Amino acid sequence: MRLRKYTVVALVTVTLAVACAIAMEPVRTSLLRALGRFLVATDRLQRADVIVLAVDSDGAGVLEATDLIHEHIANRVALFADPPDSVDREFLRRGVAYHNAAAVSVEQFHALGVDAVEVIPRAVTGTTDESRDLAAWCSEHGYATVIFVSTLDHSRRTARIMARATRGRGIQLSVLGSRYSNFDPNAWWKSRGGVRVEIVESEKLLADMLLHPFS
């Protein structure tokens, strides 16, 4: 019940903020850009033991991680496994090939000259799962510094969740939103998809801030 109340408050707040920004023509662009940048993580990057991709970062994550590898920020990449779900298994039963997203990303990395790619043998369905399993995996492998590549619109909330999961575990984790993400924080209001992402992700971020004010 409390989460639902916080979610409603967050949604109303975001909707009003967007409406006000659009209505106030003289400062409209600055306000809209500020709302977009509100979603983006601002962690400082440092040389890392490994770069890990969010499950939903897709090609944008592969491109960003490849750039970091070529800039010698890290020398290896990891991504979560993508085992078939019940729908995929039914397609397999009917003789239709399953396109494993993790395998596709590995192929893309190899094509871009990145050979040190590891698949984390854990199936995750969201950021909370990612944060829990990533913290455990890093501890198991002795990784102390990690860069986690997410989509831009999801990066700030991801940074908060990851910080809670890794606190006290001796892991320094930085979150980076891929510059190749479809979401543009400086022009999101120019497309229906951008507006939808801004409202949904702002609602989730504000709800997280209300539930975990000291993250």
Give a label for each model feature.
Residues 191-215:
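A transmembrane-helix-recognition feature enriched in membrane-embedded lipid enzymes
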Residues 2-41:
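N-terminal type II signal-anchor transmembrane helix
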Residues 27-190:
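A structural signal for short, hydrophobic/glycine-enriched beta-strand patches
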